[in-house]
Amino acid sequence: MSDDKSKALAAALAQIEKSFGKGAIMKMDGSQQEENLEVISTGSLGLDLALGVGGLPRGRIVEIFGPESSGKTTLCLEAVAQCQKNGGVCAFVDAEHAFDPVYARKLGVKVEELYLSQPDTGEQALEICDTLVRSGGIDMVVVDSVAALVPKAEIEGDMGDSHVGLQARLMSQALRKLTGHIKKTNTLVVFINQIRMKIGVMFGSPETTTGGNALKFYSSVRLDIRRTGSIKKGEEVLGNETRVKVIKNKVAPPFRQAEFDILYGEGISWEGELIDIGVKNDIINKSGAWYSYNGAKIGQGKDNVRVWLKENPEVANEIDAKIRALNGVEMHITEGTQDETDGERPEE
């Protein structure tokens, strides 16, 4: 570059920094880049691996969508529990007015430390979310759900009034404001969304999500969660078999998927995932019905091994760390937010 061009560029950069602050523009030479993307674990080892970076990326928008009773809120509460365990501060914007503190506590959420808002309108919910994000004091915000973000005009209007595109415009405007603040404050914002059917679709999937297209574009990660079956013991149903597909991923390759069990009253079966993924990665050895680790037998049958791992959390954490290291997705947590319980699952 010639001297004249260099001087002109230096003057322009100085003017930008003077007007908008230091760091408003920078060279991508590596010195200013984050060495590792900070993430918050989903509470599911398989999903952390499928995401390619070890969890949900901070400073980004994530959308989790699926049919009713598929595990959307459970997955979010598991992530909240993981964030709190590492010293994070979380907020839950409950637009559906259906938050269950008893269930959340069973999943390991410290309910007394969780900030809960139950707004009256969609505008109020998104304004609360924006204010929390801009404060810089929140690590994770969950909005449950986009479908329940009802515009004020619709609430104040009469039943049967037409309000075409109001919610989509509301979401589009809010996300334009939120995106920059989310990146600057390194906050994770998770939107839970529902599925609707498009009428008259002959080819392709008739399914779509609520709130227009803005959330699809602004989301760095989109997760499609589905219930694939039931977990039974005799005639008693103990939980759901769940599959999550990574539909969109801006931080790693997309279209991967994870399968795990959600047990009623317990949440995601982390120990069950350790067994399945551990066997797949040759960290746990399986011979017939017997499972062994480091040459020592740890149980006969998956259920017995699951119980054994619950009783021996230090071994479970060791297996988890080995699986993450083998797959190259070790979590990078903000310095200074970890506490002495890091790596341990919340006890029931």
UniProtKB/Swiss-Prot annotation:
Keywords: ATP-binding, Cytoplasm, DNA damage, DNA recombination, DNA repair, DNA-binding, Nucleotide-binding, SOS response. The keyword DNA damage applies. ATP binds at G66, P67, E68, S69, S70, G71, K72, T73. It is found in: Cytoplasm. Can catalyze the hydrolysis of ATP in the presence of single-stranded DNA, the ATP-dependent uptake of single-stranded DNA by duplex DNA, and the ATP-dependent hybridization of homologous single-stranded DNAs. It interacts with LexA causing its activation and leading to its autocatalytic cleavage. Belongs to the RecA family. HAMAP family: RecA (MF_00268). This is Protein RecA. It comes from Neisseria meningitidis serogroup B (strain ATCC BAA-335 / MC58). The gene is recA.
